[in-house]
């Protein structure tokens, strides 16, 4: 199976996420990563969906997705043609004897220290899924107490955009 990243532009309405995820579920696809958020247009949301699947069955799902009235556009983003990032928060055991190692590891991976107490250090890291997996592998021997990781968010490289808009405007979140 191959890892596929789909960027799906949808109407920002209730129930759309349920309908999209139901299509994947009916075809027995496991969604490895899912991130949904607003776009530069307050009427639209972007879903970034990562699945491990063969190309032919995935093509069937994307055809069915295109039939949903709330789906505006679907683009498959391949690794080199897209910028992909995830967010990781990880709480690591860090007694005084190991604290320097934890802090040096954070610096090496450009992670930020967001909380420190007598027994643990909490780090925030952003990067590619591979980078975050490497960070976790280095921290594992020290003892990971807990972690939370976001889904992948991705944009295609270059000047083109899914919405076709030449200039993006920020969403007003004060309303």
Feature roles, as predicted:
Residues 1-46, 50-175:
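Long, contiguous binding/interaction regions
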């Amino acid at each position: 199976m191959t890892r596929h990243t789909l960027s799906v532009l949808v109407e920002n309405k209730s129930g759309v996420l349920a309908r999209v995820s139901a299509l994947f579920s009916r075809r027995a696809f496991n969604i490895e990563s899912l991130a949904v958020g607003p776009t530069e247009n307050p009427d639209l949301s972007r879903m970034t969906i990562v699945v491990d699947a063969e190309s032919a069955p995935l093509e069937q799902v994307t055809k069915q997705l295109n039939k949903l009235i709330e789906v505006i556009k679907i683009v498959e983003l391949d690794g080199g043609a897209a910028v992909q990032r995830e967010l990781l928060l990880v709480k690591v055991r860090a007694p005084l004897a190991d604290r320097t190692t934890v802090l040096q590891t954070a610096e090496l991976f450009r992670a930020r220290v967001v909380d420190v107490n007598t027994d643990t250090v909490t780090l925030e890291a952003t990067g590619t899924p591979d980078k975050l997996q490497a960070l976790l592998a280095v921290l594992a021997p020290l003892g990971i107490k807990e972690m939370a990781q976001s889904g992948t968010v991705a944009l295609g490289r270059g000047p083109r955009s899914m919405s076709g808009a030449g200039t993006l405007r920020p969403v007003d979140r004060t309303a």
